[in-house]
């Protein structure tokens, strides 16, 4: 039965994708905040 390894691999892949997306989103948000802050100063 080869199901568990494949499902685990897929889960890790999805998890890594989600983390990567979240990090990119966070960096973009941070850049936006920095720009806004610089504009106010």
From Swiss-Prot:
InterPro entries, per this entry?
A: Corticotropin-releasing_fac_CS, CRF, Urocortin_CRF
Swiss-Prot/TrEMBL keywords = Amidation, Hormone, Secreted
Q: Which Gene3D superfamilies does the UniProt entry name for this protein?
A: 6.10.250.1920
**Keyword Secreted set for record:** yes
Signal sequence interval, chain numbering: none
List every position bearing Valine amide.
Answer: 41
Q: Where in the cell is it found?
A: Secreted
Q: State whether keyword Translocase applies.
A: no
Any single Gene Ontology cellular-component annotation: extracellular region
An example Gene Ontology molecular-function term? hormone activity
Origin superkingdom: Eukaryota
Q: Which PROSITE patterns match?
A: CRF (PS00511)
Described purpose of this protein according to its UniProt entry:
Urotensin is found in the teleost caudal neurosecretory system. It has a suggested role in osmoregulation and as a corticotropin-releasing factor.
User: To which protein family does this belong?
Assistant: Belongs to the sauvagine/corticotropin-releasing factor/urotensin I family.
- Listed name of the protein: Urotensin-1
What high-level taxonomic lineage is stated for the organism?
Eukaryota, Metazoa, Chordata, Craniata, Vertebrata
